[in-house]
Amino acid sequence: EEKLLIYISYDLQKFSSSAIEKMFSSATEAKNSGYKIIGLTASSTEERNSFIKNNNLFFEFYTCDETALKTVVRSNPGVIVLNRGTVKQKKHYNDFSDLNFN
């Protein structure tokens, strides 16, 4: 994938409302800049589907092992920006607004 934004949350129930707002805003900006957006979580299918529906998200979350997700990013949630498989940015949820999609 040329431009990929991955939100990582090993536990979707620990997503704060302010983090959700920051995620939605940065995801919208990324989408408008041509990025494919996905999420990775260790949460159950029911929790995932509920989270997507309740927050009007326009991208999917996929399942991954919790330990693997914690290895990738320690914050819950966190985000990684990839360009052709190369990590360009890795941020804590407090810094979602600092993401650069150029």
Spans of features found by a protein language model:
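Cofactor-binding loop segments of dinucleotide-utilizing enzymes, especially the Rossmann-like FAD-
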Residues: Y10, A42, R84
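Short, flexible loop segments at the rims of nucleotide/cofactor-binding pockets, characterized by
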Residues: L12-S17, F58
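Short active-site neighborhood of thiol/selenol oxidoreductases, capturing the structured segment around
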Residues: E1-K14
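A short, polar/charged loop-to-alpha-helix boundary motif
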Residues: N94-N102
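Structural microenvironment flanking redox-active thiols in thiol-disulfide oxidoreductases
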Residues: S17-F51
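A short, hydrophobic beta-strand/beta-hairpin element that forms part of a small beta-sheet core
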Residues: P77-K91
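Structural beta-sheet core signal
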Residues: L5-Y7, I37-G39, V81
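Short, internal strand/loop/helix patches
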Residues: I37-A42, N54-N76
